[in-house]
């Protein structure tokens, strides 16, 4: 995990073509890779000092790139062009042919990724297509220090149908830590953060984990969708177990309800809607108390807006299933 991570891939003086006037003006160009601070982009400053003074640059987000190309020498010497899928372009010239070639190769690798088979850039990309596709499903986050973990900093976060994974920012094959979705007690987001609280059913241990990110809403929606899918699956298991018990006890006076499956359940805000058929009275009681509190809570509260609802725990799980204090 990178604690001293820098998102600057390349920078230097170039002459960039103005979109309005079509003339080339000298500027300090900074190419930043995607990170917890923002997407992949070009930042144009008047000079190098403006970067140190944290001036406000003109930003071009580098997404939906069709190709990166070198302009013919008879058209413009030492020039590089980024062509986007909407056929717009950003063109700049460099002070030397060597510098132009370096910009071209860097932009090609960072912007085109797996589409470099026809570009002679040295060693081939060793990542399999499946692994490369997987990279697009990872989010840029910065894990804030927490007592449970000895790692923090810039990393990649991935959500699957069962787990949340953290991957090393420099080596996409190195997994740093994981949390089962069923161990989440609550989760939330705001404009710059995604936060969740995990229980004891994970290797990292229980605790609150906070990530600085510009993609908090997308991460939240992924986690919430996966959590609801687990809840739906659990509901189907309960219904099937209840059906089997009814068949076994058919014709007898004694009726026993099925036991709750041993799998721990995610405690999302909508849990009681899905498991309400298991115990209508209990779900109604939770809903009456929970929703009143939820509606009274502030929209800006990152965690307290989420209701901690779960099915009634078995006696053996009573110590684990206690709702954490707010």
Curated annotation (Swiss-Prot):
Known partners and oligomeric status: Interacts with RET and TEK/TIE2. Interaction with RET is mediated through the PTB domain and requires phosphorylation of RET 'Tyr-1062'.
Phosphoprotein is among the record's keywords: yes
Gene Ontology BP, a term: cell surface receptor protein tyrosine kinase signaling pathway
Family: Belongs to the DOK family. Type B subfamily.
Protein name: Docking protein 4
PTM info: Phosphorylated on tyrosine residues in response to insulin, IGF1 or RET stimulation.
CC annotations in GO: cytoplasm; cytosol
Transmembrane segments: none
Species, as recorded: Homo sapiens (Human)
SMART domains: IRS (SM01244), PH (SM00233), PTBI (SM00310)
Tissue specificity note: Widely expressed. High expression in skeletal muscle, heart, kidney and liver. Weaker expression in spleen, lung and small intestine, brain, heart and. Expressed in both resting and activated peripheral blood T-cells.
Role: DOK proteins are enzymatically inert adaptor or scaffolding proteins. They provide a docking platform for the assembly of multimolecular signaling complexes. DOK4 functions in RET-mediated neurite outgrowth and plays a positive role in activation of the MAP kinase pathway. Putative link with downstream effectors of RET in neuronal differentiation. May be involved in the regulation of the immune response induced by T-cells.
Motif DKFBH motif: positions: 265-275
The record's note on its domains: PTB domain mediates receptor interaction.
């Amino acid at each position: 995990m990178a604690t001293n991570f820098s998102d600057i891939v390349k920078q230097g003086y170039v002459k960039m073509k103005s979109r309005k006037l079509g003339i080339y003006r000298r500027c300090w160009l900074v190419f930043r890779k995607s990170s917890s601070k923002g997407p992949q982009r070009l930042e144009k400053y008047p000079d190098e000092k403006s970067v140190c003074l944290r001036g406000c640059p003109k930003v071009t987000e580098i997404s939906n790139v069709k190709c990166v190309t070198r302009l013919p020498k008879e058209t413009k010497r030492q020039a590089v062009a980024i062509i986007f899928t909407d056929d717009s372009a950003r063109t700049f010239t460099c002070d030397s042919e060597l510098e132009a070639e370096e910009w071209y190769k860097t932009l090609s690798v960072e912007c085109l990724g797996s589409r470099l088979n026809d570009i002679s850039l040295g060693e081939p990309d060793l990542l399999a297509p499946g692994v490369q596709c997987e990279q697009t499903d990872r989010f840029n986050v910065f894990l804030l220090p927490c007592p449970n973990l000895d790692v923090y900093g810039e990393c990649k976060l991935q959500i699957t149908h069962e787990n949340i994974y953290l991957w090393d920012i420099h080596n996409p094959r190195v997994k740093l830590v994981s949390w089962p979705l069923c161990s989440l007690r609550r989760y939330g987001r705001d404009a710059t953060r995604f936060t969740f609280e995990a229980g004891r059913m994970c290797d990292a241990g229980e605790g609150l984990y906070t990530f600085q990110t510009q993609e908090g809403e997308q991460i939240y929606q992924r986690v919430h969708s996966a959590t609801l899918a687990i809840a739906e699956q659990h509901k189907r298991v309960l219904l099937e177990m209840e059906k089997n018990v009814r068949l076994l006890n058919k014709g007898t006076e004694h009726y026993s309800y099925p036991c709750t499956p041993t799998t721990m359940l995610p405690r999302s805000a909508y849990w009681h809607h899905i498991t309400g058929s298991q115990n209508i009275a209990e779900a109604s009681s939770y809903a009456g108390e929970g929703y009143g509190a939820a509606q009274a809570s502030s929209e800006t509260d990152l965690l307290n807006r989420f209701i901690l609802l779960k099915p009634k725990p078995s006696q053996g799980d009573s110590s684990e299933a206690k709702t954490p204090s707010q």
